[in-house]
Design a protein with these regions (language model features):
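RNase H-like, metal-dependent nuclease domains and their acidic two-metal-ion catalytic environment used
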Residues: 1-105, 109, 113, 126-205
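Short, surface-exposed amphipathic charged segments that create phosphate/polyanion-binding patches used
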Residues: 111-121
Length: 205
């Protein structure tokens, strides 16, 4: 899912949103693009950069997305920590549809909870990707004394693509839609895991 082609012209406008999770030495930078159709979200593009990839290369990739993907309405960037520098570079580079979001603990809970509910309601469609499926399955949460959830992943794993995907869906929710009910899946997750044992029905081959 790391390649894309120029989208052919279409009379029907699309609603594409990209999510960007910024990393560098210990974490990967990642980009996810979703297509919003009614109340459903389809993952159409997913890219994980190598560790240590320069921010300029990631921004160049986003500019290429803008040029080749019509109707990319918004690029949502996690500007927490190192993301602040990246966000400034993105704006200075001319990415006019880029916006930053501070992922505080409450906001992280909002973003990830929304994704979880969408997946439980069968509103999310993802091309089959074993590594990304594992990334979803191992994400953990812990209830803090404050009543908030803390998210983490086991040592040796990453959740960069997951957060990029979650950010894209979180912004795409703002587009007005018509409701079309679909089957619900995995409505009772096991304690401690956010998306345990995801059914194969959400993965497109």
């Amino acid at each position: 899912m790391s390649t894309f082609e120029k989208e052919p012209s279409s009379p029907d406008p699309k609603f594409y949103v990209a999510g960007v999770d910024v990393g560098q030495k210990q974490d990967h930078s990642a980009v996810a693009v979703v297509d919003k159709i009614d109340r459903r979200f389809a993952l159409i593009h997913l890219k994980q950069f190598q560790l240590g990839t320069e921010y300029g290369s990631v921004i160049g990739y986003l500019k290429l997305l803008n040029e080749n993907l019509h109707d990319l309405r918004r690029i949502m960037i996690d500007q927490t920590g190192v993301g602040e520098t990246f966000m400034s570079m993105a704006i200075n580079s001319g990415l006019k549809n880029a916006r930053g979001i501070e992922l505080s603990q409450p906001k992280k809970q909002d973003v990830m909870t929304f994704l979880k509910h969408c997946m439980e309601d069968g509103l999310v469609h993802i091309p089959y990707d074993r590594e990304f499926m594992n990334e979803l399955n191992v994400e953990r949460f812990e209830l803090l004394e404050t009543g908030r959830l803390k998210f983490s992943h086991p040592p040796g794993t990453h959740d960069d693509r997951l957060w990029a995907f979650a950010l894209a869906i979180y912004y795409a929710r703002l587009e007005p839609t018509e409701y079309h009910p679909v089957a619900a899946v995995n409505t009772r997750p096991s304690p401690g895991n956010l998306f345990p044992q995801l059914p194969r029905s959400i993965w497109k081959r």
